[in-house]
Amino acid sequence: MTRTVLITGATSGIGEAAAHAFAGAGWRVIATGRRAERLDALVAALGADSVHPLVFDICDEAARDAALAELPAEFADIDLLINNAGLALGTKPADQANVDQWKTMIATNVTALVSMTHRLLPGLIARKGAIINISSVAATYPYTGGNVYGGTKAFVEQFSLGLRSDLHGKGVRVTSIEPGMIETEFTLVRTAGDQAASDTLYSGADPMTGGDLAETLLWIAQLPPHLNINRLEIMPVSQSFAGFQVARNG
């Protein structure tokens, strides 16, 4: 029986790679995002029988609900939700940060994620489906300038554990996956398009790729139904935990 996955933020990075991985494994993929041309390219590459695009802003609940209401029958029964859409904005410490960027991160990484989850929960419970939430190592290991971004990802981690508790006995699997350095458009978005900053961050670091995470997501999704990965932290070998910072006199 063919299963269906809905992937938010499927126009680039982890989400785009996941769409390729799941379609390649025989899943039907509902790919969501704001950039219609990117979603059209996915359909062209993977086929309309495998991928159905939904164009909307993840923070626009009315647009989301309208798009979901128009799903073709063969894509309507969703077995897996991958909450991937998210972003970091700004690199400044809290006293210099832009509060509007903070609000956008909370709206995208927290509010939109919980709203999408709530919207799909009845069907996921009925089908004993699964939810995979993309958190970050920033939820556990703070760094300068990661203030609100790290806080939103810590929320995702705790929300995932709370869902596991709430859904106990209903057969729904919930996973929080917490990736470290991965080369996507993440830094370009965070720095408002600073290509040099992005190149510097990843240069020589041998970071993870979207494909690495996509294969991990597929592995989790295809585990036997009696197994649940609660949390999974994954980094490139080149990355480790940040050391404690010390401010010295003089």
State each model region's role.
Residues A25-L42:
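Conserved glycine-rich Rossmann-like NAD(P)H-binding loop of the short-chain dehydrogenase/reductase
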Residues K92-A94, N98-T104:
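Substrate-binding pocket helix/loop in short-chain dehydrogenase/reductase
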Residues S136:
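Residue(s) in the substrate-gating loop at a strand-loop-helix junction
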Residues T117, T152:
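Active-site helix of classical SDR
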Residues V55-A66, V99:
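The beta1-alpha1 cofactor-binding region of Rossmann-like NAD(H)/NADP(H)-dependent oxidoreductases
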